């Protein structure tokens, strides 16, 4: 089991000592990744806090967060942390397929993740599920996608020029990228964004 101990050791300037924490793992490993969630309460007596469930799979770790009728699945790709720059870093968590370092998908409780319209993608070039492409780019990007009614809001960063597509089952009335309206280019359930 994972456990930690408090150790007293010299300070950086060697003029005193201070306490450090040493983590001990159940097996010898050459790298460790962790996930920390900090929840700030709005009031001292607040009781309605998000419920978090730790999750993991082949080459990924993550959380399922449930709060006020909404589920957010957060995934961290353990292959895409920058050490394997020219190696394949694709993972397949819960039916998704991506090369993103981190991604999250939010959807109403009682519905399926495949019908989600809100996504966060950190340093990724694609997000797929089955035969559906939810996001595709020739470059790795940072993306936030939020669909409300017939409007699609996108925040995209990471490259000076953007050429990407996003899945939308219906043609939106308007598309905004980084708070600027762009023409809606829609074909075969895909919205094209070129900046």
Predicted regions, residues:
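CBM-like, beta-strand-rich accessory domains located in the C-terminal region of large
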Residues: 1-168, 173, 177-195
């Amino acid at each position: 089991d994972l456990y930690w101990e408090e150790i007293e050791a010299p300070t950086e300037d060697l003029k005193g000592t201070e306490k450090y924490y040493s983590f001990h793992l159940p097996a010898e490993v050459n790298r460790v990744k962790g996930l920390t969630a900090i929840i700030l309460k709005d009031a001292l007596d607040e009781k309605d806090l998000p419920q978090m469930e730790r999750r993991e799979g082949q080459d990924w770790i993550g959380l399922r967060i449930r709060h006020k009728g909404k589920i957010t699945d957060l995934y961290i790709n353990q292959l895409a942390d920058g050490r394997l720059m020219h190696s394949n870093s694709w993972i397949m968590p819960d039916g998704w397929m991506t090369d993103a370092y981190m991604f999250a998908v939010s959807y109403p409780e009682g519905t399926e993740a495949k019908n989600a319209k809100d996504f966060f993608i950190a340093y990724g070039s694609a997000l797929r599920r089955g035969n559906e492409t939810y996001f595709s780019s020739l470059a790795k990007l940072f993306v936030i996608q939020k669909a409300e009614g017939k409007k699609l809001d996108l925040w995209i960063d990471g490259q000076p020029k953007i050429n990407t597509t996003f899945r939308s089952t219906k043609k939106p009335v308007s598309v905004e990228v980084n708070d600027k309206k762009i023409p809606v280019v829609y074909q075969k359930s895909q919205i094209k964004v070129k900046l």
